[in-house]
UniProtKB/Swiss-Prot annotation:
Pfam families documented for this protein: Ribosomal_S11 (PF00411)
Transmembrane regions: none
Lineage, uppermost ranks: Bacteria, Bacillati, Cyanobacteriota, Cyanophyceae, Synechococcales
GO biological process terms, semicolon-separated: translation
Protein name (record): Small ribosomal subunit protein uS11
Cellular component per GO, a single term: ribonucleoprotein complex
Subunit comment: Part of the 30S ribosomal subunit. Interacts with proteins S7 and S18. Binds to IF-3.
Gene label: rpsK
Amino acid sequence: MAKTAKKGPKKAKRNVPNGVAHIQSTFNNTIVSITDTAGEVIAWSSAGASGFKGARKGTPFAAQTAAEAAARRALEQGMRQIEVLVRGPGSGRETAIRALQVAGLEITLIRDVTPLPHNGCRRAKRRRV
């Protein structure tokens, strides 16, 4: 006879009006994490978690879908206003920001926090296709 798994306590619903949306956009995927002001993750989603596989994860539409899913979960927690921090060179940057706005979150600030080396490690060799 199969054992039934015990269900743990559900995550408590918090009322967090303000937060920060971290959008990490690479050429292969887009990850959206929505945190409170202290940095505690409230909701997250990615293009892969939204059902896209392979090269489709890097598309703007996949980024839009991921941002909508994360925004929906954040709105359930009572979030209204967010600051947006964008990191990376991917194609889903603008679409993800637009999707957060359309979902009903008021964007107060957009900041690009892409890390730039001050002549650090040597770059990878150029691809010859």
